[in-house]
Amino acid sequence: MDYRSAGVDIDLGQAFVRGIRERVERIQVPSSGSSETLGGIGGFAGLFELPTGYQAPVLVAGTDGVGTKLDIAQQWGQHQGVGVDLVAMCANDVLTVGARPLFFLDYVATGKLEPEALWQVIDGILAGCQEAGCQLLGGETAEMPGFYPPGKYDLAGFCIGIVEKTAILDGSRVQLGDRLLALPSSGLHSNGYSLVRRIVADRGWRWDHRPPGWDRPLAEVFLTPTRIYVQAVQRLQAAGIAIHGMAHITGGGIPENLPRCLAPNQAARLQPHSWPIPQEFLWLQEQGQVETLEMFRTFNLGVGYVLVIPPEAENQVRSLLPEAFPIGEVVAACPGESRVLGLEQWGSLTSPAD
């Protein structure tokens, strides 16, 4: 008896790591100034030289996964997008405090190492790192026979960024009257998929079905990778825009995430129907008979990221980022009331309340 007969192929695992190292060496990740990786993939630990030019540098850490979106990818046989998702979920979180992503680590767990699928995942991770401007510094691939069913894997990611201590965005800069500008999502991103899968299954749909008016099957629409907002935010930072706060709209939607970038005594007042809800969300609401407030608490509804900026900066931001659109403003919070106001005025997602 040996380890391979128990389900763990050490030789295949080592070959997989060598392949990752070769891919990393071939791909030129955008330079992060004077910082660089020291050594390479495959050691006991990854080494990264911090960039110079900071007076009081603060490291920022974020970790996340992709959730049950992985189940759709595994059924459909398309895995690269979830690699991008993994980086996006972590890098976008790190970005919210004003940090610049520096490096990323991944954790892949599977019952049996299947290189064809996992290479797609790794290629997606590398593509995400390129877009976020960070380095893939290392990771872990765990083969766990008997723990995961055949063809199944799980992912976790870890992103480290850096920010000047005096530039940290922690809610203290936000002022009453600040504008809320949204950056559009690319779709569902990586949240709400347990409900998506339940709706699809209960209504008798298959992932290869195309609802009326759709130009792609359900699986392709719902596997659209999460958008990475690093370059958009860095464009504003380079222009000297005074960003007062940022929110990454993930699990819990706008109601749970937008208040996280505000001061405790502040609330966000949304302008009802200030943006068109993408068709996939309308379809989910109709198919699942989901109440509007529950839709807001589960999905991003087309808003992937929110910028909190002073009123005088709004025109410049919209000039630099034409895709940005206004959704509301910062107001004083009332004790005991919601910190996101205006949701009750939406009624349905397609028409104002009566």
Curated annotation (Swiss-Prot):
Principal location listed in the UniProt entry: cytoplasm
Enzyme Commission number(s): 6.3.3.1
Top-rank taxon, per record: Bacteria
InterPro entries per record: PurM-like_C_dom, PurM-like_C_sf, PurM-like_N, PurM-like_N_sf, PurM_cligase
Pfam families in UniProt: AIRS, AIRS_C
Catalytic activity line of the entry: 2-formamido-N(1)-(5-O-phospho-beta-D-ribosyl)acetamidine + ATP = 5-amino-1-(5-phospho-beta-D-ribosyl)imidazole + ADP + phosphate + H(+)
Sorted UniProt keywords: ATP-binding, Cytoplasm, Ligase, Nucleotide-binding, Purine biosynthesis
Cell compartments where the protein resides: Cytoplasm
GO biological process: 'de novo' IMP biosynthetic process; adenine biosynthetic process
One GO MF term: phosphoribosylformylglycinamidine cyclo-ligase activity
Pathway: Purine metabolism; IMP biosynthesis via de novo pathway; 5-amino-1-(5-phospho-D-ribosyl)imidazole from N(2)-formyl-N(1)-(5-phospho-D-ribosyl)glycinamide: step 2/2
Top-level EC class: ligase
GO CC field: cytosol
SUPFAM superfamilies for this protein: PurM C-terminal domain-like, PurM N-terminal domain-like
Claim: ATP-binding is one of the keywords in the record: yes
Family: Belongs to the AIR synthase family.
PANTHER family recorded: TRIFUNCTIONAL PURINE BIOSYNTHETIC PROTEIN ADENOSINE-3, TRIFUNCTIONAL PURINE BIOSYNTHETIC PROTEIN ADENOSINE-3-RELATED
Protein name in UniProt: Phosphoribosylformylglycinamidine cyclo-ligase
Species lineage: Bacteria, Bacillati, Cyanobacteriota, Cyanophyceae, Synechococcales
Gene giving rise to this polypeptide: purM
